[in-house]
Structure formats: structure tokens, C-alpha cells
Amino acid sequence: MLTKKLKSRCPSAVKIDVCRTKEYTLKFHKVSSDDSGKGDMAKAESETDELYGVAFSIDKSEESNLDGAEGYGHGYEKTEIDVEGITKGPLRVWTYYATNIDPELKPYHWYKRQTVDGARENGLPEDYIKKIEAFESIQDTDVERVAKNEKYLS
């Protein structure tokens, strides 16, 4: 969701719209190779659940860059879902979903901050941003990985 990070992988990325669905909710339980939890959409469990995100278009030639960075085929798969674009109305988008989850995992502080920064940058509702901020996160002890990822933060 953080444009700077996405553009480092897919320079052609152009924002289409902020999107919402009541069919899914945000979790940070995708098993990552760095032993933390990464963001994932999970089936909604209650009527108050919702998932916001940002739809981007990218050149087809860059799709493999994004697939590699996201771990497609290694804990993430792709699917198409119907969402409601805030300004454009109904949209059909493809997204990644986790196939290897562990509900005990927590995101690293820097990862959660990237998620919050991306939500703010793209104008997601403040009450939704507060929900993201409420997720517990943990310290990453790998200082090189922290430095590499904090460069995307504002």
C-alpha cells in the first residue's frame, strides 16, 4: 500500500482508487521467512469487519517483480475479488492471500509502520488506520533489515 515501496518494485504503478470490502478483514498472520507476521486478508468474521486497500495498475511486464517480492507461490497466492472503489464504484481486482498462516505471529514495528504510512498516504479512513495501529507489533532484531525497510517510512 505504501506507494514508494511499490514503485521500487513496479515503477509503472499508478493508483486507481481506495477500495473497501465487507467480505474480508485485515490480519497480520501470514508466515514470513523472517519469522514475523505479514499482512493478509482473512474472511470476515463479523458484520463490523471490513478491509480497505488501494488498487493500483502496473505494467504486465512488472507483475513478476511484485510476485517475487510478495512471495507468490511461497505462502501467498493470487485471487480476484470484487471491491467497492471509493470514487470509481465497483471494481474487480486481483490480490494476494496467505496460504500459510499462524495466528500467533506479529508484524515487526517497521512493517506495521509501513502499513499505517501507506494507509495515511492513500487517504484511508482514520478509524480504519486506528484499527491498524491497534495491532500488536514486535521489534526486529536484524538491524540491516530494519534499516533497509525504514527507508520507505516518512
Where are these regions (language model features)?
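Glycine-aromatic micro-motifs
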Residues: 1-154
